[in-house]
Every structure is written in C-alpha cells, then in structure tokens.
C-alpha cells in the first residue's frame, strides 16, 4: 500500500531517528533507566489528573502490573465480558462491564503497591466479541450506504460500537435516525461520533529518515518507531505509506542509506522494514527535544489494552505527549489499509497529534505498544484522536528488540558447618 494521506510535507530539516544506529544514539542523547522513563511519564500523568508525582508513579506501576489480573478476569467472564476500563478520577480503579444482570462483588487487585478496586457493572447488551463480529460483518454494507466511509470501534467503557461518521452525513440523515438504523442493522448498541476527517497521517513523522517517493518523485521525510530483530539481524520499522528508499539522517546531517526489506500495509498492518549497516540498539527517543532515549524492556499485546490506559507517543511535529486509550478493536474509515481496515487498531485521545506524526512510537515507560498510523481531525485542525498499529502485527518472524535485563544474583547460603 502506498497511501500518502493528505498532502505530505517536503523535508524542512534533518532531525535524527526515533530508533537510531548505536553511535548516533550514544552521542546525541542520554539513556534513561526504566525508573527515569516511568518518572517522566508520571510527570505527564500528575499534570493531567492533578495528583502528586509519587501518586502518579504508583498509579502507572499499578496500571501495568494489573494487566495480568484483568487478563484473568477476561478469561473468567469470557461469555459475559463487554469491556474493561481504567478510571483515573475521582480515584484510580478498574471497571469491568458485563452482560446480564447477575451481580459480581467488588474485588481488589494488588498492583504497584496499591490495592486497586475492581468494580463490576452489569447490564451491557452485547459482549466485546459480539461488537467486534458486528463490525467485521456489517462494515462493508454500512460504508456502501454512506457518502463518506465511516470508521468503527469498541468503547470498552460502555460496550458500544462507536461509529465515527462525517459531520455532513449526520446533518443530512439526522442523528437519531442514523443511530437507530445502525443499531437495527448491527444488532448491537451504537453510538455516533461525528468528525470532519479520519485518515493516514502525513509521511513526515516522529523522527526523520528521508527518501524519494515513487509516486511523485518528490523528496519526503518519514519516521521510525522501534528497533526490531529476527534473531540474526536488526532493523528499524516505519509506516508502510513512506517511500521505500530511505536514508538515516545522522549527526551533521550525514545521510546513511538504509536497505529496504519489505512493506506490509493490508488490513491490520502499516509497517515497512529497513536494515542499517551500523549496529542497532533497542533505544528510542521519548522527549520533544531529543535529549533522552529509552530502552525497550518489553511489549504489550493489543488485546490487553483497556479503555483509559494512559499511554504516550512521540511525533516529530508534536513532540512527546501522553493521553488515554479510547477505542480498542478500531477499524479506520475508507481504504486506508489497501482496502478496508480490520478492527485491530487502537485509538488514543487528542489533542496532541498532527499531520507528521505517522510511524512514531507509542509506549508507556519502557514498554513498546505500537506505531502511529493516522488521526481524526476537526474542521479547525484540532486532533480528535490518533490510532496505532500494535507491535503484535510486525512482519512475521520479527519482534521488537529488547534490552536484556540483569538477572538477580542470589548470594550463596552461609556455610554453617
């Protein structure tokens, strides 16, 4: 797939990679420890929710350490589960939405040094699986019936299928009439959300590599996300809608050609892979001025993402920012995935995203989550949300390169002879 979205921007400056050759990373930035990385994200959390920094640190640790618990809850209530969400105000807690009326008592999960409340709400009219199945079954039919192709996604807070439609279509059809028709068609609860545009972000993203487009012959900049490996060699990934022939821009604006391996841009993927002649380390830029790089110590599967999860991204146009996950199981509008997109993308709330952030890394602490693909904008250019491809969908045989973690050494038992 070679979709440039809206008009891509010509290269204005050469500014270094998110995932860079080892030499460039070592000279350009300080490597954070995992604790430093989490503290940086906690600063954003504290500012957003008005809590002390130590409380923000506890909550972010609890958010990540509670994933195994919510996965177990999802398995336990597999036939009733409509969604799992994280609430940050007025207090930090986990909310589980179930179908049926049988109540479930509140529980507590020990995570991050906190006893996190788990609250169960009942009465949802469809399970997560039923909503996703409805998106897959009726997406093409609904797209064909509307002047502008809508997008679809699951809101795990409410258990609803959120249909994001063009504002002009809602005005012409009527909000209530459209909502009723979609609910009757899909047989699951539907909520409409009207926007002006959902599409790919411009190919001028989270950090710079440059190349010439085969479509128009112009020179463009694009982004890289994380360093990846197949076990024998390492490469960098970026968005599939970038030029194939790319060069890394290093210190002094020195260009180092990257070797194109392949691209995958259909349905659930938007990724291409390049190899570099220089050695690569599992680091990525995570601050706006590119003075700090983080190691990658782990990844997190798309299916474990919960509405309300607090995540961060870095884009060349917008720098570093953090916000909440909104929709999981999201299918972007139009033919942005070499045809219709599958409901496998994840959206994150705005307003900090702009044309130019495509391909940038999405993460929390030192955990890699995915690569930014596109966004939705209001008429005034404000970002409603961006959406990303999970690291689950990297090319077959490739995975995110991780920094080895020290193995705790247990001292020998004292000799009591």
Positions of the model-derived regions?
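Non-catalytic extracellular/periplasmic "stalk"
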Residues: 107-113, 119-236, 247-265
